[in-house]
Amino acid sequence: GEWITNPNGTLTMNPFLEYMVENSDKRHQINTTVYGLVSIPWIKGLTYRLNYNYTLDAKNLYNYSRYEASQQGEASKQHDNSSVWLLDNIVNYTNSFGKHAINATFVYGASRQAYDNTLAKGQQYTSTVTGYNDLGQAIIQTIRSSAYKESNLYQMLRTSYNYDSKYLLTATLRRDGFSGFAENHKFGLFPSVGLGWVLSREAFLSEAEFMDNLKLRASFGVTGNQTSRYSSLAKVELNAGSKYVFGDGASTSIGSTVMRMSNKDLKWETTAEYNVGIDFSFFKERLTGSIDFYRATTKNLLWDVIIPTMTGFSSVRSNVGKLQNTGLEIVLGGTPVKTKDFQWNVRLNFSTNKNKVVSLLGQDTDGDGKEDDLVASGLFIGESLGTIYDYEVEGIWQLADKENGTIMKGFYPGTYKIKDQNGDGEITAGEDRVILGHKEPAYMMGISNDFSYKGFELRFFINTIQGGKNGYRSKIAKPDYIGKSIGNAENLSWLTAYDYWSPRNPNAKFATAWLSPTVDTNRMQNRSFVRLQDVSLSYNFDQRWTKKLGVSNLRLFISGQNLLTFTGWDGWDPEAGIGFTTDSYPVMRTYAFGIDLTF
């Protein structure tokens, strides 16, 4: 006989066959928590606490389908076991002497995470009776297993001092160790110190009755970022393509291949941050807020540095350079109107952050007096981590360009016209790519409003992310019919299918869907947006009325999320950078209506 094909000529499996399988999914979890607290009687304020937690997850997944593996059956058994344990020893001392208050905490702890997996699989069965309980009768048999473990060891000493609730001091010293780093660099030392001054408690401000609270803060601290497990070690794999013969006349054996380079100098990425801030509350908390300014310098960034292909590897995990982040965060809250029956509360948050690469490898191989960029890794001195370095699109090649011979070699009418930056008549990666902008936004802001009138309450929240002139940019996917069969729309950008180039649509926004030039790229778009994210309207019934019904509280509400989005982004979601593709989804617009009852 002949296979029954789909209308478009493909042999895609009938989705209902997925229900004609024998599955078993058994999961077991064990959680153990041990907690102990001891107060030392002969030293006032001294305590010891023990925290221990252990979690074990075990999964047994069995599957059998007689229609898989070319209609001859496929079965598998998979066993997964993962465990995590955490142990903390905590010594704490707290005491006060008149206007002085002190606190000291010492922590010694450790944690470990482990995972083990085994999969046995069989394909093409002579009998369908035993299914996954007799994998040995399968013609094609596969066995795979994997395992990993990682551990942390840490100590921390924190002390704090408080004088008359006006002058505050906190100092911390933390030592962290992680198994994923190189042998001689597993531990990092991270100090921090913070100062606080509550001005509103000072005598010289005692007559400022409008002031509820005014506090100045300043801090400095160092934090660490750990790498992934085993990333400092070389990765070696058995490879059927790397066979060898040991001795004359011997049979071939499967050899091993080094798939990733080791780095014996891999160590902690560290960030030193300065922060100054102010907290305030005025007019009996009718106006509240906080303002923070920070500058953070990160050294020894953990980065997969691109290396020459002649080494046999594409990249190596390394510590590189220095990165600086500077930012401002503002939170404001207020009650502009407050009467007996009506109240309006508003809250605004604003944040902006700019980062730039200060240094990289410290090399000047071209002798121009400037430190070299790591172009292959996308790192540029003086630019942000999210720098977009690509070809610049300045239009679309037209039929007239081909007719008059001005079209570049390797391009066709309907393909993107890439700007020839050096004017040599060719488009090359080394000479014609430029910095087009940055992925990071210029600022983020949100504002919430809460209006209440008697039993009614209206709330809404507006969220916005703005990119400024060249920020918060991403590529928007173009149509992708190339190499696809009729009716197959994998990775197709639906939006661009409505405005792609054709002889009848020469002024289209996007390139043709049918041709691929020698050098290709996509247009960049700004993802800035303003979104009405949450809205709710509710009514609380008077308790004098609800009590007659035997109900202490009765509330009706209606709400909606993601109701409106204003943006120039051609795609489903500007915040996630998702275009109109078949493997992505829009932000869901949801509505809800409900009743809250309390008896």
Task: Report each predicted region and the residues it spans.
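Extracellular/periplasmic, surface-exposed regions of secreted and cell-surface proteins
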Residues: 1-64, 74-388, 454, 519-599
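Surface-exposed, extracytoplasmic segments of Gram-negative outer-membrane nutrient-acquisition systems
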Residues: 244-259, 294-320, 347, 354-440, ...
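Flexible, solvent-exposed loop segments that connect beta-strands
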Residues: 69-72
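Short, structured surface segments that line ligand/substrate-binding pockets
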Residues: 451
